[in-house]
């Protein structure tokens, strides 16, 4: 008898984990071997179970994000097959996950049959990319990336911080903040802080918890 595909489910919402377990329990070729709610647990559970496929959300409880967990797992097991299953559809979210080592990227509104199909395809060595994800990545390829410092500034702008507060929190001069904002506006093709935050949230460049 052919061995079942062993799946690890990482999500901080119990209903999601239980829903995925229910979907997989209805198959003959898969089984859930472990579950985790945080990035730290995800890494530990991966080490313990060595699953064939891991389903990973991006936003998790705890200090270790989904992307960080993917990086850590991929560093230990370069052949790990990880499918991101999340509600975040921004091109930057997708890019960061794939660069970290994710094999595929799915949204939580994916039909159960499609989820099972992708699990099987990834287990077989495939790297499926949906048309929607491909379109977002293609559109992203023509855009300029923000620097780490610019993202830090933008994260604080998204939290409602003014220039003086940003300067203090990031240890920079007050005069430097507008320079960063000018570069951010140009790269995001906007003219003000509100528009910059809107674009950044939509694309997944920053998140507000």
Regions found by a protein language model. Give the residues of each.
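Recognition helix of helix-turn-helix DNA-binding domains
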Residues: 162-195
